[in-house]
Amino acid sequence: MNVTLLIPARYGSSRFPGKPLAPINGKPMIQHVYERASLAKGLTAIYVATDDDRIKDAVEGFGGKVVMTSPDAASGTDRIEDAITQLGLKDDDLVVNLQGDQPLIDPISIEQIISLFERHPGEFGMATLGFEITEKCELDDPKHVKMVFDNEFNALYFSRARIPFGRDTNDYPVYKHLGVYAYTRSFISTFAKLPLGRLEDLEKLEQLRALEHGYKIKVAISAFDSPEVDTPEDIRVCESRLAVD
């Protein structure tokens, strides 16, 4: 099975302009993401998907591969679709979508999501990762997307609110969504053509589009958190963790 990992990266950000190139312990953040992803077993190729020459130059500067995408991409999925079209991937090829602001991603988590397709061939077209929340401050923070799934680890819903809600107790596990996806190439094309979902638009969570249109999203529960860098303040947390990793 051919497995291509794509790291979409935008330079523009209202909260953190130039985020992919922000230095963390002497390296741009995108380099940390790329190098950690490259430690995962089972990958055929890794590319950064970007529309910015500054990111392109930085990635090629450390020996990484880049695919340039249209600056008019309306969403992350559109950027992925653009990239895989240029790369000429086949319908049954697997694509892993790893966000460029996850410098603490554990390679084992990437291997875990790939293994779902190896163990359940043809049962679903899309998969993602979850992690049991251990920090109470994340439970009601809309920045941390929560998720619920059935007994077969098929996603039921994603929300910025705390789900599920315990009427009589607070002593139960709550899982957050880690922004890593894997899909077959054919499913990405199908997904990109689906109309915007009502719940997707309400929560501003693109993955809800698949659920609203009746498609399965298989979930793997990771033993490793992968916090995203959203603000310059998050850089300090990453530097501390990477120093002891």
Swiss-Prot record:
Enzyme class: transferase
One protein family per Pfam: CTP_transf_3
Main subcellular location of this protein, as a coarse class: cytoplasm
Annotated compartments: Cytoplasm
Catalysed conversion reaction: 8-amino-3,8-dideoxy-alpha-D-manno-octulosonate + CTP = CMP-8-amino-3,8-dideoxy-alpha-D-manno-oct-2-ulosonate + diphosphate
InterPro entries recorded: Cytidylyl_trans (IPR003329), KdsB (IPR004528), Nucleotide-diphossugar_trans (IPR029044)
CDD domains, alphabetized: CMP-KDO-Synthetase
Gene3D superfamilies the UniProt entry points to: Spore Coat Polysaccharide Biosynthesis Protein SpsA, Chain A
The keyword Cell membrane is annotated on this UniProt entry: no
Record's GO cellular component terms: cytosol
Involved pathway(s): Bacterial outer membrane biogenesis; lipopolysaccharide biosynthesis
Domain of life, source organism: Bacteria
GO biological process: lipopolysaccharide biosynthetic process
GO molecular function: 3-deoxy-manno-octulosonate cytidylyltransferase activity
Enzyme Commission number(s) of this protein: 2.7.7.90
Keywords, in A-Z order: Cytoplasm, Lipopolysaccharide biosynthesis, Nucleotidyltransferase, Transferase
Keyword Nucleotidyltransferase: yes
Entry's family note: Belongs to the KdsB family.
Biological role: Activates KDO8N (a required 8-carbon sugar) for incorporation into bacterial lipopolysaccharide in the Shewanella genus.
Protein name: 8-amino-3,8-dideoxy-manno-octulosonate cytidylyltransferase
